[in-house]
Amino acid sequence: MASHSLMSPSPLTSHSLLRSSFSGVSVKLSPQFSTLSRSKFQPLSVVAAAKKAVAVLKGNSTVEGVVTLTQENESPTTVNVRITGLTPGLHGFHLHEYGDTTNGCISTGPHFNPNQLTHGAPEDEIRHAGDLGNIIADANGVAEATIVDNQIPLTGPNSVIGRALVVHELEDDLGKGGHELSLSTGNAGGRLACGVVGLTPV
């Protein structure tokens, strides 16, 4: 096959040309087209999008509420709680294993506990991941709280999406009450209302 030559349309001096040959083809290009300025190209940085989830709590009583969960990157999850219809005082508040409410809140199963530890306070090293402590209802039965916790991520193998948040009848003793249920449920009594955690637009 005859050799073919591709030339730049404008006159170029020999020192301003780059030559490359392959398969009998000779290519001559101006450096301004063949050389890319590194200063114009910056490495791409990947930023994980923030995640947001919501749970609407309902039960067989007048207790109801809305809980939102937000997380940015690998930071702890922020939980904003507002529940109404409670008796004044402390109420256990937990994340439970399953998002199954076919039999009411009882079918949400035990506390979310991927590490198979005993029940404790949110600040304890030994605790269920779903141990979120107590929320406090005021004289009007309204509980508002903000919880920041690093064991309830919205992504990854231990994601809480599809699990259920539950508010309980009694105060959670945080595993320190000496009751036979202290190290499993905090002896927090019945389940007043629950809601499945689902993703929502940020």
Swiss-Prot record:
Disulphide-bridged cysteine pairs: C105-C194
Annotated positions binding Zn(2+): H111, H119, H128, D131
Keywords: Antioxidant, Chloroplast, Copper, Disulfide bond, Metal-binding, Oxidoreductase, Plastid, Transit peptide, Zinc
Function description: Destroys radicals which are normally produced within the cells and which are toxic to biological systems.
Gene Ontology molecular function, alphabetical: copper ion binding; superoxide dismutase activity
Gene3D superfamilies, alphabetized: Superoxide dismutase, copper/zinc binding domain
First and last residue of the signal peptide: none
Required co-factors: Cu cation; Zn(2+)
Transit peptide: 1-48
Binding residues for Cu cation: H94, H96, H111, H168
Recorded GO CC terms: chloroplast
UniProt enzyme class: oxidoreductase
Subunit and partners: Homotetramer.
E.C. number(s) listed in UniProt: 1.15.1.1
Localization per record: Plastid, Chloroplast
UniProt source species: Medicago sativa
Protein name: Superoxide dismutase [Cu-Zn], chloroplastic
Similarity comment: family membership: Belongs to the Cu-Zn superoxide dismutase family.
